[in-house]
């Protein structure tokens, strides 16, 4: 439900609930609505859940009170904090912590999946919060992406304990609750279950969602979803590491007793890659005994006393866990003092510039915390109390709404009397934090000179040149995750000469601001990082408002291997093909309507873009390697310049690139490298482009998907290039061995295999060509086939039966050594044969498309000396045991007849495309 905007003169001021001004609507349900409020004393934003008790039955009302009871027991940095409970006759108001950046569901929908390092940090926070709950015998039972919120610093906050319950070790629960995609199989089967094991399953689904951006179990209907959950089968995408896969599989085990426990998850190999630093919790933990007065924050108690709030009543409220106005103001003031420190991302390694070089600052901070007052929490002698803001006799405040409103919201708009104590003053609005702090910078008078050790110190030069800083920002932005600005702003900051516009937030509204917050923390509303600011402070804009100095963004140096990917194009690469937001939310239970949540088809996701981060790193380091060490051989010869459109240039360039490697050495490829990667390598104009981020991102991330037909054509083109290359190399080898066009070797001669590099071909093709239509099996060739000229007069030759006797001068078959070691280029078109002519005395046979006329096993060929040649050639070709014949002798009549029983074996033969190196021919190898 949305609050209606009536005319300004009809409104009596902002809508108020107790000390809270209602500023908007965050969410709504059947019996409750969540409003965004701001405390009028502390100026802190809160989320107020307004529940209409008159619409609830006894069972649901009991669940509401149980949720309140559970939230009162929980006090953890990664669990939404309960500040106050207000109850009237028909309404219940739950004031809780406000997570400014919303659900991680929406974050994944807008930004795509997280990388495993980010997912690990998020999952550690979830794990610590769930472990905290289980330690207090509380089970959540509804862990899902919609209930994982992100605060101002992109840290996890678990919300919505509406399905939470208490459990005892060994006792089973039976309530069917939760969201179907996250529900464990024992819930679908209607069995009793142990609460912690149920949360372990849900956390496994959550981890899968963080890493993959999709649900492991999903279906168009509830029965199909149930079937998939009970089978326990889910897809693992190509980008998931083996350790992460192992952890998820051990959590998503059908048998609850075999699932990992929280202690085992903490010790898992994937979790131990990066262990977060433990920090103290925000508030002191209540033990079995009641906390003493000394355990409360004296600074906050004194401040409340200066505001006219009874200190004794505040202490009693805290000890009794009343969660009234006194406790709420105390919690909010403590939050405003310390929340930014507890919400700071903690890293194990602190950079030297991030850490102050002296302990004097820490001692000053400790002294200021025990003696002084915060900056924006002013004492009366600073003349900053504004007691006139609140009525002096504001014992009762009316819950009033505008006169114009919709009927659906009428139940939440009735005026309720919420008693509020008398307060003589309030705090000023939070001041935007100063994001730049130099060593000797003079600060405004309302800011303390002391700062916490998280303060950043800039490098000086970067502050003066925005264009140079923006260039550095662009170069280092590539390795960082995408973050949204937490608030939509109106002011645009244009970088000089950069051509890009950045939107900056100058709203003075902040969750928590104090003296430490003002002194240079980067935490404001620019959540570009979840890590500690370190190493490089980069200017984003000049002063956008009088109250804000030049904001800096602190970025870590990027991985050099990933520098080729800018953040925007990494976002496109990380984002799944279908939007994560498309479809229903997991909380919607209308599964029978055929709507699919998270339409992430992982079977397609695993086959899209066979380009992995490994390939990019390998290609990049192959390019960087020769530049770093000139003695090394070129690492990627296949990346030579193939931009020329002429086929001859392509062939010659490919020969040059291949000749840089030995004959038996091939470029190392990734096991997962696909045809598309090879295609992109040929598309690459200059290998040096790999080191430039903006040019190579298009190569890897913007390549449109291609059909199977296009991939087949590219594959054929690659085969054609290989064939042309091998053909030219063989021709050069023939020339080297002094094999003339009309010459013919001796019958017993066997050619040695080429073992050395072959020079480029220098001999022109013979003037004879073969023009015959190709069969569909054969690959087309850009060049016409070359063959020896003595076959030109026997083009129409048919295979005739041979006599059974074979002379001693029968030609031997093709050596098996040649058949095995020749690469398989596409077969050439066969030469036609003339009917009635004698068969050629060849050491090979051309394979036609008619399989029955293929070469029979071990045919007997006549001697090559039957053909008339001139005297010079004849003297060179014939051996001592081969007599010269003056003319064409009579050839044997025919081959042996081929029986029909031998045909099946002939049809089963496999074309291995073995090459006859003497005549560029091909034979069948069975």
Curated annotation (Swiss-Prot):
Residue positions, PTM Phosphoserine? 534, 587
Please note every region of biased composition (Pro residues).
822-834
Kindly indicate whether the keyword Acetylation belongs to this entry: yes
Q: Where is this region: Disordered?
A: 644-666, 742-776, 801-896
- Which protein, by its recorded name, is this? Serine/threonine-protein kinase SIK2
Tell me which InterPro entries the record gives. Kinase-like_dom_sf, Prot_kinase_dom, Protein_kinase_ATP_BS, Ser/Thr_kinase_AS, Ser/Thr_kinase_SIK1/2, SIK, UBA
- Start and end residues of each Protein kinase domain: 20-271
**Predominant localisation class:** cytoplasm
Q: Tell me the subunit arrangement.
A: Interacts with and phosphorylates TORC2/CRTC2.
Q: Which reaction does it catalyse?
A: L-seryl-[protein] + ATP = O-phospho-L-seryl-[protein] + ADP + H(+); L-threonyl-[protein] + ATP = O-phospho-L-threonyl-[protein] + ADP + H(+)
UniProt modified residues of type N6-acetyllysine: 53
* Processing and modification events after translation: Phosphorylated at Thr-175 by STK11/LKB1 in complex with STE20-related adapter-alpha (STRADA) pseudo kinase and CAB39. Phosphorylated at Thr-484 in response to insulin in adipocytes. Acetylation at Lys-53 inhibits kinase activity. Deacetylated by HDAC6.
* The organism of origin for this protein: Homo sapiens (Human)
Q: Tell me, what is an example of a GO biological process annotation in this record?
A: regulation of insulin receptor signaling pathway
Gene symbol here is SIK2
EC number of the protein: 2.7.11.1
